């Protein structure tokens, strides 16, 4: 279970970051990722977002209720 609570305001921040393709920092299972937010998605009926690693171009999917933290950084 996530220690991080998704409020309406935080989801709005994520959606704005996706619209503007901004960088976001997320923690999942003790690892921090810095990615460019691309789009919302679902994985096995769970809300998620897809981000692109800025150095490698790899697309990564993050299930929202698995994240420990989230922050828009640029």
Q: Language-model segments: what does each one mean?
A:
Residues 26-34, 60-63:
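Short coil-to-beta-strand transition motifs
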Residues 33-41:
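Short beta-strand-centered aromatic/proline hotspots
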Residues 61-74:
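Structured surface patches comprising rigid loops and adjacent beta-strands/short helices at the edges
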Residues 51-60:
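Short solvent-exposed strand/turn elements
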Residues 45-50:
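Short aromatic-glycine-enriched beta-strand elements
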Residues 28-30, 44, 55:
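A generic beta-sheet turn/junction motif
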Residues 18-28:
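A short, Trp-centered hydrophobic/proline-enriched beta-strand micro-motif
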Residues 1-17:
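Mixed-charge, Lys/Arg-rich low-complexity intrinsically disordered regions
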């Amino acid at each position: 279970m996530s220690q991080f609570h998704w409020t309406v305001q935080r989801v709005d921040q994520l959606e704005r970051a996706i619209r503007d393709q901004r960088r976001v920092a997320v923690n999942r299972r003790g690892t921090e990722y810095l990615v460019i937010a691309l789009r919302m998605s679902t994985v096995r009926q769970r809300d998620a977002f897809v981000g692109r690693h800025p150095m490698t171009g790899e697309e990564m999917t993050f299930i929202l209720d698995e994240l420990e933290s989230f922050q828009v950084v640029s």
